[in-house]
Amino acid sequence: MKEMYAQLGISSEVYDFGHKIEESLKERFEKFDKTAEYNQMKVLLAMQKNKVSAECFGSSSGYGYDDIGRETLEKVYADTFHTEACLVRPQITCGTHALAIALFGNLRPGDELLAPAGKPYDTLEEVIGIRPSKGSLAEYGVSYRQVELLEDGTFDYNSIRKAINEKTRLVEIQRSKGYQTRPSFSVKQIGELISFVKSIKPDVICMVDNCYGEFVDTIEPSDVGADMIVGSLIKNPGGGLAPIGGYIAGTKECVENASYRMTCPGLGSEVGATLGVNRSFFQGFFLAPMVTKGALKGAVFAANIYEKLGFPVIPDSTEPRQDFIQAVSLGTPEGLIAFCKGIQAAAPVDSYVDPEPWDMPGYDSQVIMAAGAFVQGSSIELSADGPMKPPYAVYFQGGLTWEHAKLGVLMSLQKMVDKGLVTL
């Protein structure tokens, strides 16, 4: 095996260092295996219950009326996530788009949106109107309020209680930390927050941004009271095969409201051609528990490797995982660049490309990105990026298989060793 890694540029020293770390993680990895096995059975049961057949893999065009594959897939998602209804569509271009559809579909002028975990993803700032933008919720008369987390990264229940008022219509809970330094939330924590919110105002819609979280646990936020969960098919649930798409799962009313924003009033979920992606959507969802498991193993492997070398990592090497994003503070621009070059060199696509920092629109510093993916922007595929400013943190994620995620981590370490940035 070592000889095969040598052909890919991994030295004996780096391979042995990684092998020792991997051996120490066997018990942890077995837990991921058990979670994936449970979730695999859950998806399989949903597919069997809804009688998925070869007919479901057909294509529709134009209006997309009576697309049996689309309709069956949405039932499979709803049964897997234990919700009343679901939209799963290629017309939803990304996670931000799915969230925007869900928000606009369920909020009206005069309503207020509450974020109880601080500011959401940067990409939602213009959707909400935190940063002025044409067509934002703010422009339509929807107000916004946020409550910061406590210093220990937990919910500030006293401030949340005070923030909820007669205008509060929807509470948006972001499960994953994304590119923030706060902890990601467990499903249990989210359930406790939802129970608290609904004890104050029962008619509030609790929506969870589920991106990066699907199949990490054996339960989803929809199992603990969420009215809607929203995500992207180029993350976990697409299993690396979905070329595009997003989903909105939840109560029949919430999903129906969202459908009228996705298309238009009067049409809703009845239209939307699938254009030949049904097979990829079904197969990707079937594989998603296993693919997510590989990405989780890669994240924990990276945390253990770099923590052992003295780098601050978030989450740390022993924390329970709520998503597969791993942050490593590398301390120097050279370290960040070397790490990303290693990830790119491990890619199946564009491995010959040399990533460099660049002025990315919307950021106050240069950013370096590494991704050699089959699907552009796919977060479930091996990738890494980070802003060129202290603490020079890299955000590592993905890997369609554990073996590929492992190679990516070893290759990042190899590049740092070659540059003299670490000593093993």
Language-model features and meaning:
Residues K2-E22, K26, V43-K49, S53-C56, ...:
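Conserved PLP-enzyme active-site core in the AAT-like
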Residues R28-F32:
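Short N-terminal edge-element motif at the start of the domain
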Residues A36-Q40:
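Acidic, PIN/NYN-like endoribonuclease modules and their adjacent C-terminal/linker elements
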Residues S60, T80-T83:
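Flexible linker/loop signature enriched in Pro/Ser/Thr and Pro/Gly
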Residues E84-L87, D111-L114, R169-L170, D203-C206, ...:
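Structural motif
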Residues E307-L424:
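Conserved C-terminal alpha-helix-loop-beta "cap" of PLP-dependent enzymes
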